Swiss-Prot record:
Molecular function terms, GO-annotated: threonine-type endopeptidase activity
Keyword Glycoprotein set for record: no
Protease listed as a keyword: no
Compartment list: Cytoplasm
One GO cellular component term noted in the UniProt record for this chain: cytoplasm
NCBIfam families for this protein: arc_protsome_A (TIGR03633), PRK03996.1 (NF003075)
The protein's assembly and partners: The 20S proteasome core is composed of 14 alpha and 14 beta subunits that assemble into four stacked heptameric rings, resulting in a barrel-shaped structure. The two inner rings, each composed of seven catalytic beta subunits, are sandwiched by two outer rings, each composed of seven alpha subunits. The catalytic chamber with the active sites is on the inside of the barrel. Has a gated structure, the ends of the cylinder being occluded by the N-termini of the alpha-subunits. Is capped at one or both ends by the proteasome regulatory ATPase, PAN.
Role, per record: Component of the proteasome core, a large protease complex with broad specificity involved in protein degradation.
Record keywords, A-Z: Cytoplasm, Proteasome
Activity regulation comment: The formation of the proteasomal ATPase PAN-20S proteasome complex, via the docking of the C-termini of PAN into the intersubunit pockets in the alpha-rings, triggers opening of the gate for substrate entry. Interconversion between the open-gate and close-gate conformations leads to a dynamic regulation of the 20S proteasome proteolysis activity.
The protein, known as: Proteasome subunit alpha
Amino acid sequence: MAFVPPQAGYDRAITVFSPDGRLFQVNYAREAVKRGATAVGVKCGEGVVLAVEKRITSRLIEPDSYEKIFQIDDHIAAASSGIIADARVLVNRARLEAQIYRLTYGEPAPVSVIVKKICDLKQMHTQYGGVRPFGAALLMAGINDRPELYETDPSGAYFAWKAVAIGSGRNTAMAIFEEKYRDDMNLEDAIKLALMALAKTMENPSADNIEVAVITVKDKKFRKLTRDEIEKYLSEVLKEVEEEEVKEKEEDYSELDSNY
């Protein structure tokens, strides 16, 4: 008789809790996000920034066709990590909900309303048979009265953040945000902080494998940065990172000298 692990029944069933209160399929969906490319978001008084790593696996792929930041409405955007096909379904649903709200009420949808709609859909996929959880997390950003930034989890939970990261580089990026985030940052500072957090999680950061979008308080319009703009900000950030690393090495050497 083949050995069956004790958790196997809970492992296969999406709607059954394990004895210790877990839904294994939801945990596995979170693992898919942890393996995904890093995406970061930073909020400031002038607007909100989204930046993502584009993992282009072949030089034959057209970089512009590999989209990781999506426009939901004029004033709302989303960045994804995890299974990109799952993220696309969620993005299309968010776009639909935003248009339904606009047609029904004659005004742009609040960011929080669209986030809740998407997370309601995610939660449904943890509760019913015949479906599986979405293996994707979204960072959703937008502006109604003020800048807003949310993280959505495969379980259907969502949280508002000042700065946040998802994907394989989450821990590294969050450590940088904890150290360097300031409430009085302007939009340029927020872009540089997002790029710094992203660059620290990547082997060879460049304008070709990074995508950045902003929504400003001034016009409440979604806009992707051009390659030249990304290159300009990234060169400044990489120079700053290099200077910090040199300074850290000098401090380490001086500490060693003082011990002799």
